[in-house]
Every structure is written in structure tokens, then in C-alpha cells.
């Protein structure tokens, strides 16, 4: 039911004709998301190519009825520390939240089922030890026992708001009062200003470094690939798809945010706050400013992305889940590799 064409050459992938075809589908697809924007994909690839042995498996497909699909994957050939396991993963893997295929039209249940069945059969021909399909939202996976439900992804429908007052009315009494109180407390200290940057040249020296330092202190165990976030910020713009902003108090940064925006959706990706102002909740006030900005720009959704952090409850009115599937190679060599990894984990 599906015919696949797989691109396995990086030079072909970055050719203008291919990028144009990719961009066209990205703009038309009902399953479109910012994480498969060519810019974000290229930044991820440029980050990890010096760190990992990655080979492209960029899948283009067409059904008998003319539906089209694009799904960028890579074959990750791991080193001896990981038993030389070969794993097929989506582009972006753990750094990007969603990996939904880009369909030209919403696939029917039958079409979606055959897509996954036939694609997995095609991917098996690469003789990888495992195929890890992670980060596929509801509607882009099959509801069967092969797939497991993963993290919740809260979001806020912005179409119900036409102004900042509408947003305030939506918030619960406690949150609404806290926002007003913290803004008042900050303004008593000095001038409070929300600033976004149209290019990396506008970002004052030291701002990015302060942002990363604050984030690392808040989440010290979170892996950050060398230069990844720097490359993202270097491509920031007020017109997307990469957005970088700060909340200033008397010209001192008290909160930062690196996020994305694409086709009416704002993605709340990487916030950080200045620990010096922890009691004034600067991250919360920055989030408020970002949502107001999204309303003013006419966006229809504010996506809080993956995670069930408590704070998201008061800032969202909907949710969906991401789903995963793992397909293991049943050959003896693959079983031995996985046994080695399991034993290594048990030993610690």
C-alpha cells in the first residue's frame, strides 16, 4: 500500500531541491511540527555528527491513494561502551519533543496501520539491533499493544483569547493574584521589561552564558550536547522558528527562554530563572509575557511540550500524549548485545 524512497546521503539531503520539497510538505502537512523544520534538523545533525556515528535514513513515502509522508530517521552506530549496538532513531531523538511523520493528508486508520507495518518491515532490512520509535503523538501511532503511552503534553488553546484581560480571566484566582502580585513586587524594585531578539547580534555579551549557567544549576543532571543550544540561539529570530527572549529588571536578566514558533503554535521549550530573584517567580512572569505575545500574534496554541510539571496545570486547558515503540532484532548477535547492556546496567 506504501512505496518508500529512502535517502541515505547527507549531501542529497541538504540539496536545495530536496529542502524545497521538504519545506513544501512541512507547510501543508496536518501533522506538521517545528521539530522537523529543516533548520532545527540541520542544527541537531551538525551537533551530533562529531559526537556520534550517524547515517541518514530519510524516508519519503506515497500510498496507493496518493497520500505522501516524510519521516527523517538516522542509524546510530554506537561504540564499544554500548556493545556496538546499531539503533534506528528519529531525528532529534531526546532533544526534540515530537517526531510525528509529516503526512500530506490525515491518514485513515487503515492507511496509518499499513504505513507503520510496511515501514518497519522496510527498516528491518537495515539489520539494526533495534528500532526506537519515540515521541509520536496521538493520531500518529497505532493503538495496539506494540505502542506504549509515554509523557503527557499539556497545551493552552489561544483561540478563546483576544486580549491580555481574557487570559487573566481564564486563570484561577490564586494564579491570577500571584501574577499580579509578583509583577507589582518586581516593578517596586525597578523597571521590568520583556525583550526578544531578532538576531544573535542583538544579544548582549554574556546573556546566553548566564542563561545556560542558570539552567544547568536548576537541572544539573540534564545532558546538554556541546554547542547544541548555542547553535539554536545563533539562529534566533522574532519571526521564528527559533525564539530567544529575556525578562529584564533594571537591565539585569532575571529570566530567559529558548523556544520555537511555527504555523500558529508557540513551543515552550527551555526556560530558566535567575536564582537571585527566586522569590519573585521571574520564570512565571516570563511565561505570562510569552503567552500574551502569542495571543497578540494571533497564534492558536501554546504548547507546553512534554512533562507533567505541576505549574503547567494552571496554564493549560488541554493535553495529548506521546507514544513509543521499540522493535528488537531477534538474531543471536543482537540478543547478546542487549544482554551485555542489561548486565552492565545491573552491575552499575
Q: Which stretches of residues belong to each language-model region?
A:
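Acyl-donor binding region in acyl/amide transferases
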Residues: 55-56, 60, 78-150, 263-319
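Short, surface-exposed, polar/charged, turn-prone segments marking secondary-structure boundaries
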Residues: 98-101, 159-161, 181-185, 222-225, ...
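A short, structure-level motif marking secondary-structure boundaries and short turns
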Residues: 104, 167-168, 218, 274-277, ...
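Generic hydrophobic alpha-helical segments
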Residues: 115-119, 232, 343
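Active-site/acyl-donor-binding loops of N-acyltransferases
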Residues: 2-4, 8, 75, 137-170, ...
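A conserved beta-strand-loop-helix scaffold within acyl/acetyltransferase catalytic domains
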Residues: 2-88, 134-153, 161-163, 167-279
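A general structural signal for short secondary-structure boundary/capping elements
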Residues: 178-181, 199-201, 293, 304-305, ...
Amino acid at each position: 500500500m506504501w512505496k518508500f524512497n529512502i535517502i541515505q546521503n547527507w549531501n542529497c539531503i541538504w540539496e536545495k531541491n530536496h529542502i524545497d520539497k521538504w519545506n513544501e510538505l512541512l507547510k501543508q502537512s496536518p501533522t506538521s511540527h517545528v521539530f522537523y523544520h529543516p533548520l532545527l534538523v540541520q542544527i541537531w545533525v551538525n551537533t551530533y555528527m562529531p559526537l556520534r556515528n550517524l547515517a541518514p535514513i530519510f524516508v519519503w513515502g506515497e500510498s496507493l491513494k496518493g497520500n505522501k509522508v516524510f519521516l527523517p530517521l538516522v542509524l546510530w552506530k554506537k561504540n564499544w561502551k554500548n556493545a556496538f549496538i546499531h539503533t534506528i532513531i528519529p531525528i532529534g531523538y531526546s532533544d526534540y519533543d515530537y517526531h510525528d511523520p509529516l503526512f500530506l493528508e490525515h491518514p485513515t486508520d487503515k492507511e496509518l496501520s499499513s504505513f507503520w507495518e510496511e515501514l518497519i518491515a522496510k527498516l528491518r532490512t537495515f539489520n539494526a539491533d533495534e528500532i526506537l520509535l519515540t515521541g509520536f503523538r496521538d493520531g500518529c501511532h497505532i493503538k495496539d499493544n506494540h505502542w506504549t503511552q509515554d509523557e503527557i503534553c499539556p497545551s493552552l488553546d489561544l483561540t478563546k483569547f483576544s486580549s491580555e484581560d481574557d487570559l487573566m480571566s481564564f486563570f484561577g484566582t490564586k494564579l491570577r493574584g500571584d501574577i499580579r502580585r509578583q509583577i507589582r513586587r518586581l516593578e517596586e524594585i525597578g523597571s521590568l521589561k520583556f525583550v526578544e531578539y531578532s538576531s544573535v547580534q542583538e544579544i548582549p555579551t554574556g546573556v546566553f552564558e548566564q542563561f545556560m549557567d542558570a539552567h544547568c544549576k536548576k537541572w544539573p543532571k540534564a545532558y546538554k550536547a556541546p554547542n547544541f543550544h548555542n547553535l539554536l540561539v545563533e539562529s534566533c529570530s522574532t519571526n521564528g522558528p527559533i525564539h530567544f527572549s529575556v525578562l529584564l529588571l533594571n537591565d539585569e536578566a532575571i529570566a530567559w527562554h529558548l523556544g520555537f514558533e511555527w504555523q500558529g503554535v508557540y513551543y515552550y521549550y527551555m526556560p530558566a530563572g535567575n536564582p537571585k530573584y527566586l522569590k519573585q517567580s521571574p520564570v512565571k512572569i516570563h511565561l505570562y509575557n510569552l503567552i500574551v505575545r502569542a495571543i497578540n500574534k494571533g497564534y492558536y496554541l501554546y504548547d507546553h511540550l512534554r512533562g507533567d510539571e505541576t505549574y503547567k496545570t494552571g496554564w493549560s486547558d488541554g493535553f495529548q500524549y506521546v507514544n513509543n515503540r521499540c522493535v528488537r532484532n531477534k538474531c543471536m548477535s543482537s540478543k547478546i548485545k542487549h544482554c551485555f547492556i542489561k548486565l552492565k546496567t545491573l552491575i552499575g
